[in-house]
Amino acid sequence: MEQVPSAGRLVQITVTEGYDLKGFKGDTPVTFIRAEFNQVVLGDSAKITVSPEGSAKYNFTSSFEFNPEGGITSDDLAHKPVFLTVTEVLPKEKKQKEEKTLILGQAVVDLLPLLEGQSSFQTTVPLHPVQGSPLETPRSSAKQCSLEVKVLVAEPLLTTAQISGGNLLKVTLEAAYSVPESFIPTGPGQNYMVGLQVPSLGEKDYPILFKNGTLKLGGEREPVPRPKKWPIANILAPGANNIPDAFIVGGPYEEEEGELNHPEDSEFRNQAECIKKRIIWDLESRCYLDPSAVVSFQKRIADCRLWPVEITRVPLVTIPKGKAGKTEKTDEEAQLSFHGVAYVNMVPLLYPGVKRIRGAFHVYPYLDSVVHEKTKCLLSLFRDIGHHLIHNNKIGGINSLLSKQAVSKNLKEDKPVKEKDIDGRPRPGDVQAPSIKSQSSDTPLEGEPPLSHNPEGQQYVEAGTYIVLEIQLDKALVPKRMPEELARRVKEMIPPRPPLTRRTGGAQKAMSDYHIQIKNISRAILDEYYRMFGKQVAKLESDMDSETLEEQKCQLSYELNCSGKYFAFKEQLKHAVVKIVRDKYLKTTSFESQEELQTFISELYVFLVDQMHVALNQTMPDDVQGTVATIYTSSEQLQLFAFEAEVNENFEMAAAYYKERLVREPQNLDHWLDYGAFCLLTEDNIKAQECFQKALSLNQSHIHSLLLCGVLAVLLENYEQAEIFFEDATCLEPTNVVAWTLLGLYYEIQNNDIRMEMAFHEASKQLQARMLQAQVTKQKSTGVEDTEERGKRESSLGPWGITNGSATAIKVEAPAGPGAALSILDKFLEESSKLQSDSQEPILTTQTWDPSISQKPSNTFIKEIPTKKEASKCQDSSALLHPGLHYGVSQTTTIFMETIHFLMKVKAVQYVHRVLAHELLCPQGGPSCEYYLVLAQTHILKKNFAKAEEYLQQAAQMDYLNPNVWGLKGHLYFLSGNHSEAKACYERTISFVVDASEMHFIFLRLGLIYLEEKEYEKAKKTYMQACKRSPSCLTWLGLGIACYRLEELTEAEDALSEANALNNYNAEVWAYLALVCLKVGRQLEAEQAYKYMIKLKLKDEALLAEIHTLQETVGFGNPSF
């Protein structure tokens, strides 16, 4: 890295002109300018007479030497401005030996641009009047009272590497609120101080001090925005205290990073900031961090996490007569009191892109052991570093090895009001002053409180004292990827799919040509037929029998062959058939075997015959036969059928339904996501990844596609891609709770605790904001809500907080496989349940269900049959292998339960175990009814019914009236073969006022149990409810069976016909149709239904035997008789 030359460089400050000036003795006073920097006078200008217009050309240049190795450093330039004081020289009176001067005003020049790489800059700075100055009343001219200033250095003070690698730290101390009652504004003066240490040059720590806070009584809130002030003493003009363009703007408590940003804290903070006593500083101190200090700062934050910010007060004692007007505390009299500390969590500064944290932080008594345990800090800034920090403006770094004589601390203080802000900034190379503690003994000096007990500091806790602090960096310590970069990376990994172009000369054209040739040939054959048999046809008309027609057919065929027309017709079709082979079947190469050739020819023949019939029907429609209405199944119905097939473990049929949806609408990304979720369920991760990537290629801004691509990338251990997908999702939708949570889980896998905490914190923040907004919306719609309930809800909305212990536990106990993780969760739950049972009894609670806040249940069809489309939208892609429950978000939820809902909805069961571990350890989560339901569902998927039953018992203890619990218990008993218990659970579920989240299979399975137990009336009612909610082949089949057993044959046939229309590949439907037709005596239909049943291979032997028995009874129905 480039090094700054050791020789000092000159910084020149030139005041060229002043505007709108006037004096005490008139509008054309004689004035001069004094330049000061770092409490050193740089020089005085010549005495210039102000023009009648108020301007004065000073052309005054002063300078100081910048030398980072000793003297004025980058840190000095960062937080110390140049003061330009304009003084009027009054005319000499008689017998007056010296000229009398009066100060008119003071201007402040900020040198910060020199640390940003500029070698010169020009600015117009306002001239702030002192009290009583004539400048308080401006002239009538439009120009403001100001000075024109130029700052120049021969070359940039910092190298390119220092500018790019360094940083600027700004610390703003606003106030301490709700201070102890023992703080009173009357009596001896007190210096209220706050301090912290930061690395400034390499590993050396430098203290930042804020002194002389103003104790104020309560009564009104501090105004915002209000200006930030320089941490410099003895500023003459009140307006010069304010840092240009720097303001305290405040903001909502919920957006702060501190400890008092929860909804339940708002009432206390409102009282503290309006009514109670407070100490006001409003100071901003700036510190330049060189590149090595930036690295040290990052490392210190990562290692310590919490930063100690100390607060104390020291009495100000008036110096005896002869030094009137000065208040200063001598070393002998110095005594720290009310020594407290606030622990500031600096970790958010290591979050990508974060440059600022602001918040309120509790003040605790300063105890060495506690401070060291929390922050790893061994020294107290006020007690161990020494009293020179209280008075001196120039102090050496704590770890500095350089030594120079300390500069005298006797500062000019004209009035007590001007003692407000003593600069506490260090200078490299200065010596450490002795500490209060004796250098030769570990025994505290007299008056120093014991290190293990701090009764005065305890008053901060009793009063609820907190400080409001802001820490800001010029550049983020950890850069954040820009959204454009993330979008580019996603585009590189998954190129967007271009829209399909229509080909005019492809398969469609080949089909059209074939149809045209068929029509032409058919007309030619008809012409030949009428030529040969026209008179005979006209004579016989409709009396022609089949033998005559067969004879005419043979004669026509013979004539076509003999005349060569048959050969001509074949040649005419040949070109069209070749185009179909090439464009439709994409066959352009020879076949590898004779068997393959024969198979293809057979397939082609069937296709050509079908298309010939299509063409002939278009040319010669059958006027006698009426048009048959085609039954079209919608995409939503296909999704329901696929769900039923999944639950019944007929994965081949489910895949067929999903693929049919894709064939119909290949550009619909939801269809790709549903098929990908199905592949996740069957653990075909490669196929699932392909589906999700295809969905993302259709819309690269689709959040769910990005998240699912990220989940699959994690499962397939493509971690770099996973980070890109998750980050892009959070950039596209910063309010998405699931996106932030999944990003945090990814960082956990990468052992990046800080970023994990960042993502979880942001997820919790977004969830809290959403729930608060929902509460506001509810209040507006329903009126005033109960105060007690509102308080309970607010207290449960605290942000997710991670502890080191919980993070470690999860990392240790989350192996790669879901099965291993679930076994560990089982053990953990057993231990936690034992502890819980020791402390309290199980509580039976009634789960409140608020539709204004809860999401709609996923698989519940609540509309009538005509509104199938709306009803089907409720399904989304939320099927599980077994009829799982998809829980709506209750009023109080966690970021992890939200993520579990998403993962279960898309069937990413392999990923759920990671989130369950966090939900168990989350302060707002833990073993809840909903948690046990999800855990039971995962065990049902593994067919571990004993564990699932155990967790369902736990869920029932926590919420006995939850319909989801009883519904899942019913499924558990049904799958394990205990149909009597399943029946009881299902009946209890449907008896609740509120439906379970998934009712479709509850009705189906309950109806099946009724059929088994020959309770046909109950089965009929149950299946009718299912048909009304979500009609499918299975619901109509169940209704048809129930009606058949009740001898209601007409209703049975109608229901079975509906079932057949929705799925004509169900052998059981054909079987019952055959039974109905046998009963009503329709032989042809009975034989046809029986034929299809045999073709589809009915597996129910008892039903097959029943059909054979009935066939023998009626004497027909089996073509083999």
Swiss-Prot record:
Q: Where are the TPR repeats?
A: 635-668, 669-702, 704-736, 929-962, 963-996, 1000-1033, 1035-1066, 1068-1100
Noted disease? Spermatogenic failure 41: An autosomal recessive infertility disorder characterized by oligozoospermia, severe asthenozoospermia and flagellar abnormalities such as short, absent, coiled, and irregular-caliber flagella. Some sperm show tapered heads and acrosomal abnormalities.
* Recorded family membership: Belongs to the CFAP70 family.
| Matches recorded under PROSITE patterns | TPR, TPR_REGION
Its main subcellular localisation, reduced to a broad class, is other
Tissues expressed in: Expressed in testis.
Q: Where in the cell is it found?
A: Cell projection, Cilium, Flagellum; Cytoplasm, Cytoskeleton, Flagellum basal body; Cell projection, Cilium; Cytoplasm, Cytoskeleton, Cilium axoneme
Query: So what does this one do?
Result: Axoneme-binding protein that plays a role in the regulation of ciliary motility and cilium length.
Q: List the gene name.
A: CFAP70
Which Pfam families does its entry note?
TPR_8 (PF13181)
**According to the UniProt record, where is the region Disordered?**
410-457, 778-802, 836-858
Q: Which InterPro entries match?
A: CFAP70, TPR-like_helical_dom_sf, TPR_rpt
Query: What is the name of the protein in this document?
Result: Cilia- and flagella-associated protein 70
Q: What is known of its domains?
A: The conserved TPR domains are dispensable for ciliary targeting. The N-terminal half is important for cilary localization and/or binding to the axoneme.
Kindly list the residue ranges recorded as spanning the membrane: none
What GO CC terms are in its UniProt record?
A: axoneme; ciliary basal body; extracellular exosome; motile cilium; outer dynein arm; sperm flagellum
> Which GO BP terms, alphabetically?
cilium assembly; cilium movement
Protein keywords = Cell projection, Cilium, Cytoplasm, Cytoskeleton, Disease variant, Flagellum, Repeat, TPR repeat
Question: Which intervals carry biased composition (Basic and acidic residues)?
Answer: 410-428
- Domain of life according to the entry: Eukaryota
